[in-house]
C-alpha cells in the first residue's frame, strides 16, 4: 500500500477522530523533512544494507542477562555479516495501535528508525496490543495503523523491503491469558496476516518456532537467550533466502511406503528461488521454491509395486537426496495418545504373544518432541 504523500488527504480522512488527526499531521510533517533530504542521501555512495528491527520489549531484549549480545537483532547481525548493518529499534511496552497505552509512533525509537532509512525493516509488534486497555477499545484501528507504519517506512525509502512477523507466543501462565489475552492474540495474528496481503509485504513467523518451547518464557511473554536464536534464524532465513539447502521431512526415508492409486504431494525445503527436481519410477517433475524456501511436487497416482528409488535434487546448489527401497502400497495411520506408544516388549505377557515376521511390512515410528 504505497502512499504518494505522507500528508495526503487520504491519510487525513482515514482518521476522523481529533486526536488521531493531530497525531497523523504531526507524523506527516515530521516525515516531510526526511523526504526533503532523501535526494541528498541517495546521492551518497551505498554502504552496508541497512536492517531496522522494529518492535517492543522482545526486540529490545528485555529480561536478557546481556541484551547487548543476546537480543535477536545482535544475533541477526552476526548471521548476516559485514554486508549488513542491523540496528535495534525495539521499545519496551510499545503498541502498534496509535491509541494504545504506549504507541510506537510516539517513541524516539520510531523517529530513529525513520532517520535510519532502512533498506529492510523487520517489524514485530502486537504483543502489547493484547492489553485490555488496547484491543477491546481500538481493534478496528489495528490494520489501518499497521498500514500507516508501513507507509511511513516507504515514504523515507520507497524501495524498502518490509517483513512483518506473527507475534511470539504468550504463555498460559500470563495472568490475563484466559480472560482475553489468548483470544485477542489470535485475532491480532489474523490481522497481521491480512496486513501482509493488503500491504504487499512479506509475512514471517515468530510464533511457530517458539510455540513448542514454553520453558523459554519464564514470565510467559519474554523469551530467554535460547529463544532469541529462533527469532534471529527466522529473520535471517527470510532476508537471505538461506534455508539450509535441500531438505526432506523426517517421514521420507529409505524403505518407506507411498499410498497406491492416489496422487501424492511430496514437500520439502531448499533455499529461496531454487529449482527442485523430483524423479520416481520413470517420472520426473520440477518446481521452484517460494520465498520461504518451501516446495511441493505432486506425483501422479502409482500402482502397487517396488522397490523403487526416489531422488530429489537442486541443480543450482548441486545437492541431491536419494531414497532407496521405496514401495508403493497401502499406508495405514495409527494415531492417538501416549498409550499408542506402548511397546509390546513392556507387556507382562510378551512371551505369550506370537510375532509373525513379514518382510513387506514397514513401520515408521514418529518420535514425540517431548515425553508426556
Predicted regions and their residues:
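Extended acidic/polar, glycine-enriched regions
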Residues: 267-335, 339-343
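Proline/serine/threonine-rich low-complexity linkers at boundaries of modular beta-sandwich domains
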Residues: 243-248
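Structural beta-strand segments of beta-rich domains
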Residues: 262-266
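Short, solvent-exposed loop/linker segments at the N-terminal edge
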Residues: 256-260
